[in-house]
Curated annotation (Swiss-Prot):
Catalytic reaction annotation: 1-(5-phospho-beta-D-ribosyl)-5-[(5-phospho-beta-D-ribosylamino)methylideneamino]imidazole-4-carboxamide = 5-[(5-phospho-1-deoxy-D-ribulos-1-ylimino)methylamino]-1-(5-phospho-beta-D-ribosyl)imidazole-4-carboxamide
GO cellular component term of the entry, any: cytoplasm
Main localization category: cytoplasm
Pfam families: His_biosynth (PF00977)
Entry's localization field: Cytoplasm
Protein name (record): 1-(5-phosphoribosyl)-5-[(5-phosphoribosylamino)methylideneamino] imidazole-4-carboxamide isomerase
Native source species: Rhodopirellula baltica (strain DSM 10527 / NCIMB 13988 / SH1)
Entry's Gene Ontology molecular function annotations: 1-(5-phosphoribosyl)-5-[(5-phosphoribosylamino)methylideneamino]imidazole-4-carboxamide isomerase activity
Amino acid sequence: MSSQTPGSEPRMEIWPAIDLRHGKPVRLRQGDYDQQTTFGDDPVEFAKRWQESGAKRLHLVDLDAARGDSPDANRDAVQRIIEATGLPCQMGGGVRDEITIESLLNVGVTRLVVGSRALKDPDWFVEMCDKYPGKLVAGIDARDGKVATQGWLETSDVSAFEFATKLRSRTENIAAIVYTDIAKDGMMQGPNFEGLAEMAAASDIPLVASGGVTTYDDIKQLVEMKMPAAIVGRSLYDGVMELGEVVRLAGDV
């Protein structure tokens, strides 16, 4: 994650999102697979567009693998994005075993977001973090403060904040936490700033804000909160924000 030198302007990493389903770029509302918007046929076009607008990294999501469908449905698209841009790529969705971890790292993915398996088998996740230091990110997706799993199709009884605290006590090798408030995702209503503040207080693991980042004011507020990073999705696709301005406001230049 980014470091900030004394006296410098706050800097927040921006991760433009590309969600993939059947090899195409899409967006879901609140993780609902029946509320899908498809943005053309070729995700590489968006990857190049974000790069030309100032993106220094990309956040990719395999929606097919996330809910247990074919783990290979989007593999070709991921590889083409990496080859076309050369940008560091963070990827989530269906990362539930070491074979998948090794396969995606070999394709060129920089780091992987692990959600469901991290919650259900924290011993395994800690082991993988220690085996692949700095390569694994805990994906904590919350609905009403509880961790959701299986592509957001199931909600557990585990508090998102307690889960983050326990992870930090087990290993120093987690790269980051991507924290998503499902109620905010794709709704264009702003992030859950209160939840983000609670999560930041629960752990010193670098936090990536995800879900509902919609306006330039949202970006400014996240910077003021000293949020290390943010994922921006639908607002870019819908033209509500220009990535170049988002990057400028975040100081990610």
